[in-house]
Amino acid sequence: MAAERLWLDVPFAEKDMAKAAGARWDPAARRWYAPRPGMADLLRWAAGAEVPELLPGEDRSLGRGLFVDLVPSSCWFTNVRSCVAERDWERLRRMVHGRAGQRCEACGAGPDRAARRWLEAHERWSYDEARRVQTLRRLVCLCTDCHTVTHFGLAQVKGRAAEARAHLMRVTGMSEAGADRHIAAAFATWRERSRLTWTLDLAMLTDAGITVVPPPEAADRVAAAREALDAEEAGREAPGRAAPGGEALRRIPRQRRRTPG
């Protein structure tokens, strides 16, 4: 009887390091493993406990389909990836992709290296304006194209707005006018929510045993987002930061003057 695989939790940024230490990639499981016991150099990536497929309090009916879902500027860097350790993010990402059958939950597409299409985990939030609490309610698996639509402000910054708009129309069946109305309404909601300072509720993660770290203070989040985007454009990642799905990092005045898209 074959021995059970010694699985590893290897963050994407550390894959080359793990490979050099002897880790091997299982393409079927889409996961790294130790080819034999006793490989001390791989212990740092020893797999933790699996994350439950349904997180505590998660509502998998929330936010179905594809739509523009802009995170208020006062909430930048409250995304899950910025609030958990890279290894925990790998565990969460693997669970989200696995329960979705390695398919985008908005359009049904799978990963395609040739098309530069990957699967990504995205947060669905609820906003209690009376209490000013932003609560994580769901993690959803999206392909690169659908994720770009979701973070339409970042698509504008990166010069991909027309591409994102076309994908939104293709997946949802919206007309050009309908897509423009949808995008404009999303930015109107974004502007209203960005006027408030939100308290973050990540109980869905902490109740599952995931350790979270506090995001930057609300007053510092826009500057931190710009720093991360500048680093990304320069081909590097700011220490401890992943560029958020930031809305209007450099074009806030432009977005307030005209209809997006």
Language-model regions: role of each:
Residues L6-A21:
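Short amphipathic alpha-helix segments
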Residues K15-M17, M39-R44, V133-Q134:
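Short, conserved charged micro-motifs
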Residues M17-W32:
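Short, flexible N-terminal segments of the mature chain
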Residues M95-A100:
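Sequence/structural segment immediately N-terminal to covalent heme-attachment motifs in c-type
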Residues A28-R91, A109-A115, G159-G261:
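A boundary/linker detector
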Residues A3-V10, R30-A34:
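Short cationic amphipathic helices and targeting signals
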Residues A85-E86, E90-R93, E105-C141, T150-G159:
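Histidine-centered nuclease catalytic patch
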